[in-house]
């Protein structure tokens, strides 16, 4: 799903680092997976991969399954992790992360 954007080895390392429930940190994950240093274009491409229902927003249910977009065998985020992730990215308070909010979150 992320071929041409992210390296498989980086994805594997990023997933390994947050294997245990409660250890997911979006900033650390973005850095490890190599997203932080990507172009605005690649960051937007990643958004559209994560936006599974193609609504133009990443909603709470998509955030919960965020890691599984990177690898089908990955765990779901805990409710606390999901809510913290949403709160960090949802700057306008509409309950979802839009593409501009996503770009700002990745670069934060």
Curated annotation (Swiss-Prot):
Keyword Cytoplasm: no
Residues bound to Ca(2+) 1: 51, 53, 55, 57, 59, 62
Annotated GO CC locations: cytoplasm
Gene Ontology molecular-function annotations: calcium ion binding
Keywords assigned by UniProt, alphabetized: Acetylation, Allergen, Calcium, Metal-binding, Muscle protein, Repeat
N-acetylalanine carried by residues: 1
Function of the molecule: In muscle, parvalbumin is thought to be involved in relaxation after contraction. It binds two calcium ions.
PANTHER family: PARVALBUMIN, PARVALBUMIN ALPHA
UniProt name for this protein: Parvalbumin beta 2
Organism: Merluccius capensis (Shallow-water Cape hake)
Organismal lineage: Eukaryota, Metazoa, Chordata, Craniata, Vertebrata
